């Protein structure tokens, strides 16, 4: 099982990635992490009770990696529960690098955005994220 760690100033967020249910989304996320794409980027959108969103190289929600990926919704049983990691997009099949972590269940997002991971440690760190806070770095643990 693959895990990702988001290193924040206050501590680490450990995320279990859903390799089987969202293989292309996970592969893209892992690739970007290994390339250092996310290092130093911010959580540019933080809405208490909803989501903390990051992964925009422009820092305002308008940027991405220069390409898009397809949604992985069919056959993906994962829901937008507390701590879910999901791919942000501006319409179907337009995800790229921006992702969000859900603070509270958001069933209206199920079947719309690809859930590709779940926070397994550090939800207290997620709860403390503020808008504009930098990610110090991300790493992948593969086993």
Question: What is each PLM-predicted segment?
Answer:
Residues 1-143:
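Cyclophilin-like peptidyl-prolyl cis-trans isomerases
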